[in-house]
Amino acid sequence: MREKLKVYLVTGRYDFSDTEFLKRIETACRSGVTLVQLREKEVSTRRFYELAVKVKVVTDAYQIPLIINDRVDICLAVDAAGVHIGDDELPVALVRKLVGSTKIVGVSAKTVARGVEAENEGADYLGVGAIFPTTTKDSPLTSLQTLSEIAAAVTIPVVAIGGIKEENIEQLMGTGVAGVSLVSEIMLAEQITEKVQGLMRVTERMLEARK
């Protein structure tokens, strides 16, 4: 599980056409991202499903896990690798019961208590943040100290989320994270291949420092 979380792409639609959206995801997959999370907050269930089907064709071609944000029904409908849920979604234990033992269940956590609870209820990994300022998440920032405390309190992998950029990844050294989750840094990159390769290099340096 830990290796799959190294450079974790969360999709952002922005103003892209479907063709451009899928092209950017495909380029990111080809360039080395290790996991893709499809995040759609403002579309109908049918539209989300149709996008998920198309994205899964891409991720399957590169043998990269596809995680669905929030929607257990969409995860099951397209047979995605798993689902990621936030604080205000279904209880983790119920999600685990619904998706079964073989699906990946990721959970957002901002406190040690939430992280420990999520692990006890069946989570496979935690997303912790926002660590740095971001327009994607409007919640208060999570400190590097809290990130470290959560990572130390659980046995499942932890991913840093929120405002992650190539130039600030090294600040995560020593926090115990397994990887980084990025949206605009990849989706809006002018040269996605070069960006992903750069992210992979700096992330691997950051991870090496913990050994």
Swiss-Prot record:
4-amino-2-methyl-5-(diphosphooxymethyl)pyrimidine binds at Q37, L38, R39, E40, K41, N69, S108, K137. GO terms for biological process: thiamine biosynthetic process; thiamine diphosphate biosynthetic process. CDD domains: TMP_TenI (cd00564). Its cofactor is Mg(2+). Keywords: Magnesium, Metal-binding, Thiamine biosynthesis, Transferase. GO terms for molecular function: magnesium ion binding; thiamine-phosphate diphosphorylase activity. Binds 1 Mg(2+) ion per subunit. Disulfide bonds: none annotated. It catalyses: 2-[(2R,5Z)-2-carboxy-4-methylthiazol-5(2H)-ylidene]ethyl phosphate + 4-amino-2-methyl-5-(diphosphooxymethyl)pyrimidine + 2 H(+) = thiamine phosphate + CO2 + diphosphate; 2-(2-carboxy-4-methylthiazol-5-yl)ethyl phosphate + 4-amino-2-methyl-5-(diphosphooxymethyl)pyrimidine + 2 H(+) = thiamine phosphate + CO2 + diphosphate; 4-methyl-5-(2-phosphooxyethyl)-thiazole + 4-amino-2-methyl-5-(diphosphooxymethyl)pyrimidine + H(+) = thiamine phosphate + diphosphate. Its EC number is 2.5.1.3. 2-[(2R,5Z)-2-carboxy-4-methylthiazol-5(2H)-ylidene]ethyl phosphate binds at T134, T135, T136, G163, V183, S184. Pfam families: TMP-TENI. GO terms for cellular component: cytoplasm. Pathway: Cofactor biosynthesis; thiamine diphosphate biosynthesis; thiamine phosphate from 4-amino-2-methyl-5-diphosphomethylpyrimidine and 4-methyl-5-(2-phosphoethyl)-thiazole: step 1/1. Mg(2+) binds at D70, E89. The keyword tRNA processing does not apply. Belongs to the thiamine-phosphate synthase family. Condenses 4-methyl-5-(beta-hydroxyethyl)thiazole monophosphate (THZ-P) and 2-methyl-4-amino-5-hydroxymethyl pyrimidine pyrophosphate (HMP-PP) to form thiamine monophosphate (TMP). This is Thiamine-phosphate synthase. The gene is thiE.
